[in-house]
A protein has these predicted regions:
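Post-transcriptional modification and biogenesis factors for structured RNAs
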Residues: 1-168
Length: 168
């Protein structure tokens, strides 16, 4: 890709501020846009939210929406809906520039009517059948890094530096 592609992360009705803060930090570190769709289970100035995101908030490109209708009216997709119910794996998809990875609330996921209307774009992360779901912020991180891997990690550092030693 010649220009840096855009990846969008969408949280629909998040309930737990620490999860949203962790997702915000992931978005800041990977240059993803974050879209928060209400109603949310916390105030945006919640201390737990800010603490989980550390001091990365100024790196964040974030938008807020009153609900799904507001979000869809302002964004054109393509959308990929992460759900525990889908038959297609997240690694079986080739993600285009401008993709929106959409995640539901921690306690309920995405509305089933939305999933049923968009079956071809519903994807899942494989896991044991004895567990309900992965943590929201972990799921977002896995999804983000799969897309960035496919895009060859555009404009992200691929090496680090030791503080007191040199790599050989």
């Amino acid at each position: 890709m010649s220009e840096k592609p855009t990846l969008n992360i969408v949280l629909v009705e998040p309930r737990i501020p620490q999860n949203t803060g962790n997702v915000a930090r992931t978005c800041a570190c990977t240059a993803c846009r974050l879209h928060l769709v209400g109603p949310m289970g916390f105030a945006i100035d919640d201390k737990k939210l800010k603490h989980a995101g550390l001091d990365y908030w100024h790196y964040l490109d974030i938008s807020y929406y009153d609900g799904l209708d507001d979000f869809f009216a302002k964004n054109s997709g393509p959308y990929y809906y992460f759900t525990t119910k889908a038959p297609q794996r997240y690694t079986d998809v080739t993600y285009p520039d401008g993709a929106y990875l959409v995640f539901g609330r921690e306690d309920a996921g995405l509305p089933e009517a939305l999933l049923a209307a968009n079956q071809e774009h519903c994807i899942r992360m494989p896991m044991r059948d004895t567990c309900r779901s992965l943590n929201l912020s972990n799921s977002v991180a896995v999804g983000v890094y799969e897309v960035l891997r496919q895009w060859d990690f555009p404009e992200l550092l691929d090496h680090g530096h030791l503080r007191d030693y040199q790599w050989k």
